[in-house]
Amino acid sequence: MKYLSIFASALLATASAYGQSGESCRTASDPTLQKPELYAGYDCVNLLDSTAVTVQPTGSGSFTVCKIVKVMNTRGAVANRILKYDYDPLTAHAEFHRVTIYKANGDVINLDITQQQDYAAPARAIYWGARQIMMEIGRLDPGDIIDYQINKKGFTYALLTGGIGNDESRFIPPMRGQFYDIVPFWTTEPTVRKVYKVNIPMEKEMQFQFYQGECTSSMRYEDGRKAYTFVSTDIMPTRREPNMVDLFDAAPKLMMSSTPRWQDKSL
């Protein structure tokens, strides 16, 4: 009970700390304790997988990536002892904002994020110049919960011709003022709640389509801006089949664009 009380209080504090992320950085109670049979055999469970984006008039976005992962067994402990996140330095910059470990015995550990590493991402055959950030967590035990936030700025999905700039201009998309994203809604581990929220200037329009599945969506006005929120709950891992096409063509995904037509993004 001590562990549950500490974790619940910490989640409330975390939700408040996220500020602009609001709804997208809240999570429900831990269902692995309520329905253990549903998650038996899985190495870890994502209690929350959330991304909140604030889009600037230029089309550049500020991303808040929140994830809360519960370790279920020793395999999950080994798999999560190091956190990694990939990004493209041509279009974005990413860094760990905070990492907190809620131990099964009730201890709470806040890691020193100044110890994070940023290095060239491992690659073979073709080297695109991608980078990776990493935080070493160390020893974990079954029942431990990892709660972390990554802040990223920039954009995704564009064909570029120039090199890496040294100023903020590299975070502005080639189609200046336009925002575009493809968001996978499939998972490799059970996920209790997945949220994608994008906040855009009032004068911008946004079209979206959810493929190979369904989610709950809403659009609200917040502080003179439009906020689109997409939520999916109780997601189980997508099963692959022999000779199956890529999951982008078979599993649930969200596509968003501020351009009047999808085709405009391909020009």
Regions picked out by a protein language model, each given a short descriptive name:
Residues 1-25:
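Bacterial Sec-dependent N-terminal signal peptides
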